[in-house]
Amino acid sequence: MKNKFLLTTSILGILLFIASFNTTYGQKKSHGAANKNFIAANWKLGVQMWTFRLFTQQESLEKTANAGITFIEAFPGQTLDKTGKEVFGINMTAADRKKLKGFLKQHHAKIVAMGVISPVNKEDWIKAFDLAKEFGLSYITTEPIKTHWDLIDSLAGVYNIKIAIHEHPKPNVYWHPDSVLAAIKGHANIGACADLGHWARSGLNPVDCLKMLEGHIYGVHLKDIVTFGNKNAADTIVGKGVIDFAPIFAELKRQKFKGMFSIEHESNWENNLPDVIETVQFYNEQLKKLQ
């Protein structure tokens, strides 16, 4: 009888262990799948077209396609193609816009954002929002003058297109998150475009900056630099410079960031597509580690 009791107890113990293991494993697996699904659904990888500023928009779209990227952040002033002098911007004609839509369709690409722009008056801001609406943009990257904060917040609400304040290095007025937060205060449609490289150039820890701007980040400029705290530091391939990206991605995951990472590579201008492709690979590797 005693042996039978011990056997029964042992079997029950084993079954409880198996059940506990399966529950724990299932929870971890479910949590990992949820993380993977959230990132896949809410994180976009794109290219800030300034990266290919030496080329036309048509050529740049071909390059982004070769890098496996379909999302872009357009910049004003980029020539559309080699047939003329038409450029991307608020004064594009209907014919220019139709041409650009054709290029986008050809490469299955979408403009998610544009910038960095700083219109000087209400009329130009309205033109900017009209252009953004026509191409289905999510946000406009800008460094607006203070007297325009109320105006652009109002327009952003009307057009349902967010304003993302960019941060060039000091002495730019927006070099520190404090100044961006000042613009955000009382303006529900104004947030931030987190430029990781420029923060590092200004001697700021990007993770600390992200924490300060939690809940207000609409986009990220994904770049790396060779020297911390030097506003003239050169760009390098993301992951090969001074910026530690693992905690950056972890922090954005913690914040449940929803938006686009725009690769902005301001180096090797004439032949930087391989650098962009390497950045894409680095980004994908980092995402695997998050899951």
Cite the ranges covered by each PLM segment.
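Histidine-acidic metal/acid-base catalytic patches
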Residues: 3, 26-49, 53-71, 106, ...
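Glycine-rich, proline-tolerant flexible connector loops at the mouths of alpha/beta enzymes
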Residues: 74-99
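Active-site acidic/histidine proton-transfer and metal-coordination neighborhood
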Residues: 103-191, 200-203
